[in-house]
Design a protein with these regions (language model features):
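Extracytoplasmic
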Residues: 1-155
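Beta1/beta-strand and adjacent pyrophosphate-binding region of the FAD-binding site
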Residues: 157-171
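Generic hydrophobic/aromatic pocket-lining and core-packing "Φ" positions
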Residues: 176-177
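Glycine-rich FAD pyrophosphate-binding loop
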Residues: 180-182
Length: 182
């Protein structure tokens, strides 16, 4: 999941599609100036050839406009993949990034914004099964994500509460303070 990158750089966490996807994504909102790279280090257990899939979307395709203002690249160990992402479909989908050779151990992964105009990256999936195509829609995607992330089928019971405050914005802080005084 892109939101778990160690360093977000100039990319920001956007949660507007949580209902569709079940998680937030990284957004490169630079007002026309490319933002600083997001980066993380991944551990590869077995050296070899991997297919790279990037879950993204071209946010202007829905209006049948030409060009893709939210373009970005994915770099492994400082080298960009041949594909440019955020250029194919209006809906969230897995865009094929081609194949790459990876070494055992630490490998640096980066998102490089090319435009500063809202590139979107939800997740990156690597597979040594070069013909594997990750699911794009609904329940199949939810099951795939849960299995890849090692999450349980049913969430752990967190107990019973009178009030749960989600978010630390002004409204969330006010609600938490008021609840603490009751």
């Amino acid at each position: 999941e892109a939101e778990s990158f160690d360093k977000k750089g100039g990319w920001v966490l956007d949660n507007q599609s949580m209902g569709q996807m079940g998680s937030p994504y990284l957004l490169a909102h630079g007002l026309g100036v490319p933002v600083e790279n997001a980066s993380t280090v991944i551990q590869v257990r077995k050296a070899g050839k991997y297919r790279v899939w990037v879950r993204t979307r071209d946010w202007v395709k829905q209006w049948n406009k030409t060009g893709s203002p939210g373009r970005f690249e994915v770099l492994f160990n400082g080298k960009a993949l041949d594909a440019t992402f955020g250029t194919e479909k209006a809906s969230w989908h897995w865009q094929d990034g081609g194949t790459i050779m990876l070494k055992v151990g630490d490998n640096r992964l980066e998102l490089q914004d090319l435009t500063g105009f809202d590139g979107r990256c939800d997740a990156i999936f690597l597979s040594s099964e070069l013909d594997l195509f990750p699911p794009d829609e609904g329940k199949l995607l939810a099951v795939f994500r849960r299995e890849m992330l090692g999450l349980p089928v049913e969430p752990e019971d967190g107990g019973e509460y009178d009030l749960v405050v989600i978010g630390g914005g002004i409204a969330g802080c006010c609600a938490a303070l008021r609840a603490a005084r009751l």
